[in-house]
């Protein structure tokens, strides 16, 4: 077998520009999700909505409040603690990462 001839940098660059191969195949089309525009400061309107709507939910957690009320996660955690102190919701499971509540009986 004959020894392989070394290409110069210029020859390598020209070969790369010439193409020949398709671009790298993507796994999926990649649906882009819009950035959430949730509020981070509680106004009176959202506070009233929390007091009115949350006691009717059968399952209450931080993610439920974030999805339904469009508030930030830290704001949802504070709201859940406040509602628990007021006796509006009762804890089902309190974990370091997740807190699950239900409506008070």
Curated annotation (Swiss-Prot):
UniProt GO molecular function: structural constituent of ribosome
One GO CC term, this protein: cytosolic small ribosomal subunit
Keyword Glycoprotein tagged: no
Predominant place of localization: cytoplasm
Compartment(s): Cytoplasm
Keywords recorded for this protein, A-Z: Cytoplasm, Ribonucleoprotein, Ribosomal protein
Superkingdom in the source lineage: Eukaryota
Subunit structure: Component of the small ribosomal subunit. Mature ribosomes consist of a small (40S) and a large (60S) subunit. The 40S subunit contains about 32 different proteins and 1 molecule of RNA (18S). The 60S subunit contains 45 different proteins and 3 molecules of RNA (25S, 5.8S and 5S).
Function: Component of the ribosome, a large ribonucleoprotein complex responsible for the synthesis of proteins in the cell. The small ribosomal subunit (SSU) binds messenger RNAs (mRNAs) and translates the encoded message by selecting cognate aminoacyl-transfer RNA (tRNA) molecules. The large subunit (LSU) contains the ribosomal catalytic site termed the peptidyl transferase center (PTC), which catalyzes the formation of peptide bonds, thereby polymerizing the amino acids delivered by tRNAs into a polypeptide chain.
Similarity-based family: Belongs to the eukaryotic ribosomal protein eS25 family.
The name this protein goes by in its record: Small ribosomal subunit protein eS25
Species this protein is from: Candida albicans (strain SC5314 / ATCC MYA-2876)
């Amino acid at each position: 077998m004959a020894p392989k001839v070394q290409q110069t940098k210029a020859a390598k660059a020209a070969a790369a520009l010439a193409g020949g191969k398709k671009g790298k195949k993507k796994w999926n089309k990649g649906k882009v999700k819009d950035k959430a525009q949730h509020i981070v400061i509680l106004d009176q309107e959202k506070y009233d909505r929390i007091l009115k709507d949350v006691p009717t939910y059968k399952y209450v957690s931080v993610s439920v409040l974030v999805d339904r009320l469009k508030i930030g996660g830290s704001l949802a955690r504070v709201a859940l603690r406040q509602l628990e102190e007021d006796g509006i919701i009762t804890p089902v499971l309190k974990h370091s990462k997740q807190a699950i509540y239900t409506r008070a009986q």
